[in-house]
Amino acid sequence: VMWAQAVFNCNAPDRGNMEVLAKYGTPEQQEQWLEPLLAGEIRSAYAMTEPQVASSDATNLELEIKRDGDEYVLNGRKWWTTNAVQGRCKIMLVMGLSNPDAPRHRRHSTILVPRDTPGIKLVRPLRVFDNFHSPGGEAEFLFEDVRVPVTNMIKGEGCGFEIAQGRLGPGRFQYAMTLVGAAQRCLELMCARAEDRVAFGEKLSKKTSVQHEIARSRCDIEQCRLLTMQAAEIMDREGVKGAMPYISMVKIVAPNMAQNVADRAMQVFGGMGVCQDTLIPQVFTLARFCRIADGPDEVHMSQLAKLTIRELTG
């Protein structure tokens, strides 16, 4: 389960970056970066989150993108940048402040920065729950007078927020689908363990408390699976804008569901459930991480409430 996205070349952030380049990239940008990404020849990174601001509000971002003749100069700091510490990462999509005096949602831009550009400095690798996370790892970077050609700008100055929103919407579906599959695997492991393990003279599967945890987990997984399928169907039919309530719903529901199922599986496994002998700790870590990544629960709850009130009151 945990390596399936790598096998099918749809890992985050590559999938989202490929969508950005396919939708907004110039033919030259697509030839240079999209084609090798689609072929699985290289990896990419998406640098958005910053340590010094609340990055759940994308309009807070402070990394400076300043034009200087035929180049843009980048100065600032990014962290939780996935993939950028591995050797196959060749390109970074960096979101930063380019037009500070523009309206709030037109201040930022997204620009292509080759990973080997002078001035990109690795501050430190980052670990989730003190463990290496994701196939590409996470890291904090400092950008000091990083220069790239003006032709590396994606779509145009001031389009960064639009690009980020379009990119993150489908990504939240990917999280949901991944977590449904991961939770299903935890349930399978939990059932096998309950049938195999004997305590106080009977199998764990005969104990009412364990039965209830298994039943509750199956209900939770199926509810989330159906919600995700419904959300994807609406996304296909109506696009990102029409699916906005469902994007928030799956982003809220799936990580919480998977975290709860993994927690129950841990409890059934006992000590084995918290060590490296099963993937359950990985699922728990991923689920908890996803409650913050791509927008925390609280942001999506508020967004969903606003959309619901507007929809139901006219």
Show where each model-derived region lies.
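A short, Trp-centered hydrophobic/proline-enriched beta-strand micro-motif
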Residues: 40-49
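A short core secondary-structure module
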Residues: 71, 75-123
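Flexible, small-/acidic-enriched active-site or ligand-binding loops
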Residues: 60, 118-147
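Short Gly/Pro-enriched turn/cap motifs at secondary-structure boundaries
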Residues: 52-56, 82-87, 100-102, 128-137
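Short, surface-exposed charged micro-motifs
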Residues: 62-64
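Alpha-helical interface subdomain recognition
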Residues: 1-2, 10-12, 16, 24-29, ...
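Flexible, glycine-rich active-site loops centered on histidine and acidic residues
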Residues: 18-24, 46, 101
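Cytochrome P450 core scaffold surrounding the K-helix E-X-X-R motif
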Residues: 122, 152-157
